[in-house]
Regions:
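Positively charged, solvent-exposed patches that mediate nucleic-acid binding
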Residues: 1-114
């Protein structure tokens, strides 16, 4: 995922947590916030949160790679900041299910590009 499509600063994550809307399913929570008007046509940015309850660093990084790769394939409206928070049940999911659950959340949040 290109750098301009990633959320990197903790300030951005805090803004989304405070002012964003949320949707969830059994494996993920999606937080989304529309960006300022001057960024309305900019590509949407993604962030990923996995707590230490998920597992050790190797396991968390494996799931993060799968989530990043799945997010690359999502067709999302421009001008949004989106954070995916993995729940502990992510252990029950394989890559195809991760992709499907993330896609369903984006669709349910009405963030899918036309």
């Amino acid at each position: 995922m290109q750098k301009h499509r990633r959320l990197l600063k903790s300030k951005d994550f805090a803004l989304i947590r405070s002012f964003g809307e949320s949707w969830s399913n059994k494996s993920f929570v999606l937080l989304a916030r529309k960006r300022d008007e001057m960024y309305a046509e900019a590509p949407s940015r993604f962030g990923f949160i996995l707590s230490k309850k998920i597992g050790n660093a190797v396991i968390r990084n494996r799931f993060k790679r799968q989530m990043r790769n799945s997010a690359n394939g999502l067709d999302v409206k421009p001008g949004h900041d989106i954070v995916f928070i993995a729940r502990n049940r992510i252990h029950e999911c394989d890559y195809k299910e991760i992709r499907r659950f993330m896609g369903k959340l984006v669709f349910g949040a009405n963030l899918q590009a036309e």
